[in-house]
Every structure is written in structure tokens, then in C-alpha cells.
UniProtKB/Swiss-Prot annotation:
Belongs to the class-II aminoacyl-tRNA synthetase family. Binds 1 zinc ion per subunit. Consists of three domains; the N-terminal catalytic domain, the editing domain and the C-terminal C-Ala domain. The editing domain removes incorrectly charged amino acids, while the C-Ala domain, along with tRNA(Ala), serves as a bridge to cooperatively bring together the editing and aminoacylation centers thus stimulating deacylation of misacylated tRNAs. This is Alanine--tRNA ligase. Its cofactor is Zn(2+). The gene is alaS. Catalyzes the attachment of alanine to tRNA(Ala) in a two-step reaction: alanine is first activated by ATP to form Ala-AMP and then transferred to the acceptor end of tRNA(Ala). Also edits incorrectly charged Ser-tRNA(Ala) and Gly-tRNA(Ala) via its editing domain. It comes from Natranaerobius thermophilus (strain ATCC BAA-1301 / DSM 18059 / JW/NM-WN-LF). Its EC number is 6.1.1.7. Gene3D superfamilies: 2.40.30.130, 3.10.310.40, 3.30.54.20, 6.10.250.550, Bira Bifunctional Protein, Domain 2, Threonyl-trna Synthetase, Chain A, domain 2. The keyword Aminoacyl-tRNA synthetase applies. One of its GO terms (biological process) is alanyl-tRNA aminoacylation. Zn(2+) binds at residues 564, 568, 665, 669. It is found in: Cytoplasm.
Length: 878
């Protein structure tokens, strides 16, 4: 049975059991900072299990993409470990419980997958008599095929919170897969009894003291590994033989030219590359980019591990993007979004692999030096400081260092590495705090952590309010009052000031009372989701508890609102013009400009930029109303709202609809697109691998930019003595004229050099059986001096050329030696090193060619006069 068919049957089966079948969630968790990537079928559903959110149905079924890396070192070595897999699961949120979960699990296995009932075993938790009785009395599995196991095997819990016993369905693959022990049964470490389905009965809550209480809402969470089921149903020994993975393995075998099954180490490398290709494809496909931390580092680690094993197999060039092609061909039936993002995924992988190839050779060389020194010194452990140097200076992953060190029979001081890393992070943290000049979550600020600050600035730019706190952030003190000239942080409630977040910079303005006035220099959001005002008192004094009026700088905020709406419209236009793979990777919304970072693998062409500008300006001309919709997260997604994975969303969300551009956003926006007036992109740069940056202007700022460009064209036209509409034509004429003159200059230069070469050769000195050319010249730059020296040397069968020149009040030297004299011990680098000392300088180079400089050009002649002695000394000591 094909793997795609197994997946399809599973979802269809539970659809017949009134389950809401949902396509796989992204590998990137939404609003869950506790995990980097989704590693279990239930992980995206946690809010439904905890009751934080209401599920779309009390019954759900999914085939969830998962990534797990704790056992990454085992991937390729064992037949069952993988970083990427699909988890089939059916879930109940307070609906059905043990009986249905067990019956349906057995029904699907026997009737839909046609597994032999005689081969099925069940394991239950030691004390779970209810599950045992259902399996035996109602399903009909005999006592001898039901196993009671302890907490380690059959009780699911993670610290405190919901937990419960579980029951596993196992399949007996036969004695040939076993360990020959008479006690062999489910729970044994051998491969005979394959666990194919885990049914978790979440019925208890565990408190911090370890006490268990029964939950009011009992849930079901099941998981069946798709690839593991395929191994069973396709009757193959490992996941590398199933229909969706074997073609990838065959591709890697062909690419490497290695015969599978002849060398265990090479087989491991082949399997690592095969498995990691699947992981990389899906992780990049869901929007993760390689990085040095977070989920981006997980991706980088997997990709670089595969690349390194390619090198071990003798694959020299980048190779993974072709493997990505194959993974997509195989998996696009179930995941059509991979096809949509094919070129993007391939390019990101290619860029990262190429980057790794350039750095890994240098890192490997240094690591090998460390290992050689350890061997000479009789050491068994690589010091943490050395591993950190590889990581910090050369971008060499710790995991790769660990792997190579272990392969060579050594150990790694990981504690020392961690200490170095922590030291660096602490230094960076302190530097950041010093540069910011304040600690937002100070002890003084903590006094207000339970105080709610209401934001009213969507509708009001002026607000009657009250000061609830004054903080001297420099001394971490709470103040009762503040005087003219002092700078402090102030909390007011309610507040019309928007605190910097979501890329939108904070508001400025003023607050004033009967007793004083303060300029609001900036607004930020602290760790308690409160707007904090950085203010300077300009008149009188302000006291805690004062009634104040808050007034936002109107024009500045209006400009910010226009630019924020423009970022949404730009995001939409990028997806339309460049491709659906484009995702926002960062933004800055300021009053005078906007900046937008997005995922893409190449610079945008001029034509693409024009098309993007046309799309945005078209939306502006339509003058569509900007709609704000407050709704729940699920409905927002049904509206097609774009959610940024890095952002956290509550169940209640705010949707901004600007024509076809629909996004979740908490920022402030224009009321209609026509307010933007004009949109103009003025800069494009690269932020990093796979991330581009556009900077743009709107409204008055865009007009000023175009006016400036027009003035520049006018100035150029005046310089060229032509009309503005003929600037390009006239410039082209000048360029062609310059090219012609450059050719003429080059021709004259060659003629001069020919005469100069002949002149220098005529002044050469015969020493034994070779010629010495040592001369002082004037006003030759380094390039010309090298060129002339090369021409002279090429005229000599055997000889030494040393030329010196005075230029820009400095001395320059170039030395060249023919091959025969190099073999006799003449060394150009040592010659220029000595002559340069005479002029107060230094330098060096190769035996056949070297260059040096000095600060005292008046001693050039003295230096050149010493060349003959140096050459003779070198020959006499050879």
C-alpha cells in the first residue's frame, strides 16, 4: 500500500467517524514560544486541550508534519530515527474516550489496512484495568497478547498539567526480527514488536506535589507514525525502503557513485543525506530561513550535516537542491504548496550549502590542526575555547565539531564551550543595555506589572488620562514627582500613544496638566504589554496621580499610518509579482519612510520593482477604505488573513483589510488608500541569505524624492550641455568617447613600456650566468610597477628584477625572480623585505614575486644599490 494511500485512508476513516479533518499545520508553531518546531501531532492543538481556545469540532483528525532533532546523531545509524516524519492522529476534546479510541484504532488496523488480527498486540498502563478490559472483553484480544507496562512506557506526562495512561498497538513482525529471548514481547528493545499507534487517555491533572486529580474534560490524543506504518504495510526492513524515501536514497547513491551495502560508514552517510533532504525541504517550505539561533539554527544544523556527509562521500559541489527537486516531486501530491515554492526552496538550500562549503574547508583545516596538536600533546579532550573559536570565528557548528571529534576518538569539553558562549552573550546583553540607556523591565517597573494600560489611540490622538507611575530608569527608582529638565519614564492610563511594536515606531507628542508639561520623546511597550512614555519635562512639574492630557503628534502619526498601510500593500504586491513564497521577515514603519524585509533568493529586477510600484499605486488610486475587523483567529484565517509566524496572537485578533491585502495587525493605519498619495521604492539591499530589503516612501516624502531626482537630471543636463530628455543619449556619447580615449591611452602606455623595458634591459648587469635589473623609477604606481617588472622578467631567460619608485611621497618596491634562480635559493620576498627596511618600511611575498613599501622615498637609491649584495648572499648560502 502506497504511503499516500495510507494517509488518505486514515483521514477518510475518521471522517466517517464525524471527525473534522484538517490539513497539516505549519511546522512553525503559532503563538507557542515553548517550542521551536512542531514535533508531535497534538502540538498545534494544545490550546484546545487546555481549554484556552474552542476547537472547530470536538473531534479532529490530522496528518501532521513534524520535526524532531534531539536524536539527530542517531539518524542514519539506526533504521527508525528521523528528523522529519508525519504523525497521523485522531483527537477528542471532551467528547469520546477510551472505548471509541481503542475500537476505532483496532477497526482501522484490521479492516482498512488489512492487518492480521493475530499479529496485533496491545500494551496498557500497569493499573489501567479499564483499557485492559476493553481490549480483552470487547475487542477480543486474548490475555497473552495484552501487556501491562509501567510509567516509563505507558503513561504520558510532561511535568505538571494534563496527563494520563496510554495504550499502544503493536504488530508482531515475526521471530526473524526478534532477539530470541523467551520473554520477548512489546516493551522489548528488539525490532520484532513494532509500535504502530499510541492512544493517550488524558484523564488526570498532576500538580507540583505530584498529586493526580481527575480532569472534568477527558481528552484523547493519538499518534501513528505514517512512515512506520508504511514500513509494515510495504514489508520492508526500514523507512529508507518505503516508496516515498527509497527514490531519494537511490538518487543519493547514484550521485555519490557509492555502492549501498558495501561500507557501513558510507551507508550511514547515504541515509543521513536522504533523511535530511526531506527535513530541509519541508522546513524551508514552511518559511524558516537558516540562522544562528532558534528554528533557523535547527535548519542550518540539519542542512550542514547533510552537506558534510556529502563531502565524506566525495561529492565536491553543491548537490542538495537536486535532491529537494525529487522530494517535492514525491510529496507534492499531499503537499501542493511545495510545488508552489519549489524554486524558492531550492535557491535557499543552494545558497546555504554554498555558504557552508566556503566556510567548512577553513574550519575543518583549523579543527584538524587542533586534533593534531592534541595527539602530539597526548590530550583526549578538545578544549571548549577551541570549539567556541571554530563556532564564533568560522561559523563552524558545535554539532559538527562534536561529531568529528568523536569520530577521531576524542571527547569535547562542552561545558567549556557553553561557558564561552554564555560569556559572549552576557557581554552582548550588557552592551545592548548600555546602548539603550535603560532597562524597561526594571525593579521599579515591576511594581506596575498587574496594572492594565488601555490603548485608545486607534480612534483618539488626544486623551484625558492619569499618571499612574513615574520611573527614574537610570537609577531604577519610583518617583512621586518630576521637575522641569528631568527625563523619566511615565505610565499613563488610558493612553493614546502607540508603543513601538510590530515594526511600527512609537508615537511622540506631549502630556500636560495644570502644573506642568512634558515632551514625549518616544513610546515603547514593556514586558507587561504596557505603553511606556519616555518624556522630558519642559515646564513645571508632574506628579503621580495627576490628571493629564495626552496629545499625539498628529502629522507624524498620520505619516506613520500611511506607511504602515503601505507595508501591507507592498507585501501583497510582492506576493503577486514575485511569488507566493514571499513572506515578511521584518519591517520598520517610520514617519518619513518604510522598510520591508522579505524572503526571496535574488535581487529584484528593475522590471519587477516597476510592477510592484504599479500594483501599490493602483490600490492607492482606487482609494479603497481600510477596513478593521475584530474577530477570532480561525475566522481571520478563513478570510485569508496573512499571519506572521514570529508574532503571537490572542484568540481575539485584529484584521486589516486593504482591498485584496488582508493581514492580522495591531498597528495603526490610514482610513483609505488614497491618503497615501504616491508610493515609490528608493532602495533595495540584501539582509542575509534568502532575505531581501526594500525601502520606500509615500505621500509628500515620495514627491520630495522625485523632485530631488528631477533636479539631479536637470543639473546633469546642464553639465552635459544638452536637454533633459537627451541626457541618456548624451551620456552614452561621452562614454563611447571615453572608451576610445582609454584604448588610445593604453596603446601609448604599451609603447612607453616597450621603450622602458628595452632601456632597463640595456642597463642590466651580468652576474655569473644571469642578469640583474635593479633600477629606481619615478611616479610609477603599484600596478604599473608590477606590470613593468613582469614585462622585463618575461624578456629574461634567467634573472632578477627589482624596481623601486617614488609616488605620493612613499617608496614602492616590486621584485621578480625567474624559476631557475628560485630553485637555486633566490627569494623575491626576502629581497624586498630587506630593501624596504632601508626606506623605513616592510613587506614580503612569494619566492618568485613580492612587493613592499616604505615611508622614506629619499632613500630609494640607497635601497636599490643594496640589491646586488642581497642576491649574491642568497646564492652563496643556497
Amino acid at each position: 500500500m502506497r504511503t499516500h494511500e495510507i494517509r488518505k485512508k486514515f483521514l477518510e476513516f475518521f471522517e466517517t467517524k464525524d471527525h473534522y479533518v484538517r490539513k497539516s499545520y505549519s511546522i512553525i508553531p503559532e503563538n507557542d514560544p515553548s517550542i521551536l518546531l512542531i514535533g508531535a501531532g497534538m502540538a498545534p492543538l494544545k490550546p484546545y486541550f487546555t481549554g484556552e481556545k474552542t476547537p472547530p469540532s470536538p473531534r479532529m483528525a490530522t496528518s501532521q508534519k513534524c520535526v524532531r532533532t534531539p536524536d539527530i546523531e542517531e539518524v542514519g545509524i539506526t533504521a527508525r530515527h528521523a528528523t522529519f516524519f508525519e504523525m497521523l492522529g485522531n483527537f477528542s476534546f471532551g467528547d469520546y474516550f477510551k472505548r471509541e479510541a481503542i475500537f476505532w484504532g483496532y477497526e482501522f488496523c484490521t479492516e482498512w489496512l488489512s492487518l492480521s488480527p493475530e499479529k496485533l498486540w496491545a500494551s496498557v498502563y500497569l493499573d489501567d484495568d479499564e483499557a485492559y478490559d476493553i481490549w480483552h472483553d470487547e475487542v477480543g484480544i486474548p490475555h497473552e497478547r495484552i501487556v501491562r507496562l509501567g510509567k516509563e512506557d505507558n503513561f504520558w506526562e510532561i511535568g505538571t498539567g494534563p496527563c494520563g495512561p496510554c495504550s499502544e498497538i503493536h504488530y508482531d513482525r515475526g521471530a526473524e526480527y526478534g532477539c530470541d529471548s523467551p520473554d520477548c514481547k512489546p516493551g522489548c528493545d528488539c525490532d520484532r514488536y513494532l509500535e504502530i499507534w499510541n492512544l493517550v487517555f488524558t484523564q488526570f491533572n498532576r500538580d507540583e506535589e505530584g498529586n493526580y486529580t481527575t480532569l472534568k474534560q477527558k481528552n484523547i490524543d493519538t499518534g501513528a507514525g505514517l512512515e512506520r506504518l508504511a514500513v509494515l504495510l510495504q514489508d520492508v526492513p526500514s523507512i529508507y525502503e518505503i516508496d516515498i524515501i527509497k527514490p531519494i536514497l537511490d538518487h543519493v547513491i547514484q550521485l555519490s557513485g557509492v555502492n549501498y551495502g558495501e561500507d557501513n560508514d558510507k551507508d550511514i552517510s547515504l541515509r543521513i543525506i536522504t533523511e535530511h533532504l526531506r527535513s530541509v525541504t519541508f522546513i524551508v517550505g514552511d518559511g524558516v530561513l537558516p540562522a544562528n539561533e532558534g528554528r533557523g539554527y535547527v535548519l542550518r544544523r540539519i542542512l550542514r550535516r547533510a552537506s558534510r556527509h556529502g563531502k565524506l562521500l566525495g561529492i565536491k559541489d553543491t548537490f542538495m537542491s537536486d535532491g529537494v527537486d525529487l522530494v517535492i516531486d514525491i510529496m507534492k501530491e499531499a503537499y501542493p504548496e511545495l510545488e508552489e515554492r519549489r524554486e524558492y526552496i531550492k535557491k535557499i538550500v543552494e545558497i546555504e550549502e554554498d555558504r557552508f562549503n566556503k566556510t567548512v574547508d577553513q574550519g575543518l583545516g583549523i579543527l584538524n590542526e587542533f586534533l593534531e596538536n592534541m595527539n602530539k600533546q597526548g590530550k583526549n579532550t578538545l578544549e571548549g575555547s577551541d570549539a567556541f573559536k571554530l563556532y564564533d570565528t568560522y561559523g563552524f557548528p558545535l554539532e559538527l565539531t562534536r561529531e568529528i571529534v568523536q569520530e577521531n576518538g576524542y571527547t569535547l569539553d562542552e561545558q567549556g564551550f557553553q561557558e564561552e558562549l554564555n560569556r559572549q552573550r552576557e557581554q552582548a546583553r550588557k552592551a545592548q543595555q548600555e546602548s539603550e540607556g535603560m532597562l524597561t523591565e526594571s525593579n521599579a517597573m515591576k511594581q506596575f506589572q498587574d496594572q492594565k494600560v488601555e490603548f485608545t489611540g486607534y480612534d483618539n490622538l488626544e486623551q484625558e488620562s492619569q499618571i499612574i507611575g513615574i520611573i527614574d530608569h537610570k537609577n531604577d527608582d519610583l518617583l512621586k514627582e518630576v521637575q522641569e529638565g528631568e527625563e523619566v519614564q511615565i505610565l499613563i492610563n488610558p493612553t493614546p500613544f502607540y508603543g513601538e511594536s510590530g515594526g511600527q515606531i512609537g508615537d511622540t507628542g506631549e502630556i500636560f496638566s495644570d502644573n506642568g508639561r512634558a515632551h514625549v520623546k518616544n513610546s515603547s511597550v514593556n514586558g507587561y504589554d504596557q505603553t511606556v512614555l519616555q518624556v522630558k519635562v519642559t515646564d513645571g512639574q508632574l506628579r503621580t496621580g495627576d490628571k493629564v492630557s495626552g496629545k499625539v503628534d498628529y502629522q507624524r502619526r498620520k505619516d506613520i499610518m500611511k506607511n504602515h498601510s503601505a507595508t501591507h500593500m507592498l507585501h501583497y504586491a510582492l506576493k503577486k509579482v514575485v511569488g507566493a513564497h514571499v513572506e515578511q521577515a521584518g519591517s520598520l514603519v517610520a514617519p518619513d519612510r518604510l522598510r520591508f524585509d522579505f524572503t526571496h533568493f535574488a535581487p529584484l529586477s528593475e522590471d519587477e520593482i516597476k510592477q510592484i510600484e504599479l500594483e501599490v499605486n493602483k490600490l492607492i488610486r482606487e482609494n479603497s477604505r481600510v477596513r478593521v475587523i475584530n474577530t477570532d483567529l480561525e475566522e481571520a484565517k478563513e478570510l485569508g488573513a496573512v499571519a506572521l509566524f514570529e508574532d503571537k496572537y490572542e484568540q481575539e485578533v485584529r484584521v486589516i483589510e486593504i482591498g485584496p491585502a488582508v493581514e492580522l495587525c495591531g498597528g495603526t493605519h490610514a482610513t483609505a488608500t488614497g491618503e497615501l498619495g504616491l508610493f515609490k521604492i528608493d532602495n533595495q539591499t540584501s539582509v542575509g541569505a534568502g532575505v531581501r530589503r526594500l525601502e520606500a516612501l509615500t505621500g509628500q516624502h515620495a514627491l520630495e524624492y522625485l523632485d530631488q531626482k528631477a533636479e539631479q537630471i536637470q543639473d546633469i543636463a546642464e553639465l552635459l550641455k544638452t536637454e533633459e530628455n537627451k541626457v541618456v543619449e548624451k551620456t552614452q556619447e561621452f562614454l563611447e568617447d571615453f572608451k576610445a580615449k582609454d584604448k588610445e591611452i593604453e596603446k601609448l602606455k604599451n609603447q612607453i613600456f616597450t621603450f622602458k623595458v628595452d632601456d632597463l634591459l640595456a642597463q642590466s648587469k651580468d652576474i655569473s650566468d644571469f642578469k640583474l635589473v635593479a633600477n629606481q623609477l619615478n611616479d610609477f604606481d603599484a600596478d604599473s610597477l608590477r606590470d613593468l617588472s613582469e614585462r622585463v622578467k618575461n624578456k629574461l631567460d634567467s634573472g632578477v628584477v627589482v624596481l623601486g619608485s617614488s609616488t605620493n611621497n612613499k617608496a614602492l618596491f616590486v621584485a621578480m625572480v625567474t624559476k631557475d634562480l628560485v630553485e637555486k635559493g633566490v627569494h623575491a620576498g626576502n629581497i624586498v623585505k630587506e630593501v624596504a627596511k632601508i626606506t623605513g618600511g616592510g613587506g614580503g611575498g612569494r619566492p618568485d614575486m613580492a612587493q613592499a613599501g616604505g615611508k622614506e622615498p629619499d632613500k630609494l637609491n640607497e635601497a636599490i644599490m643594496k640589491v646586488e649584495t642581497l642576491v649574491r648572499n642568497q646564492l652563496s648560502h643556497s
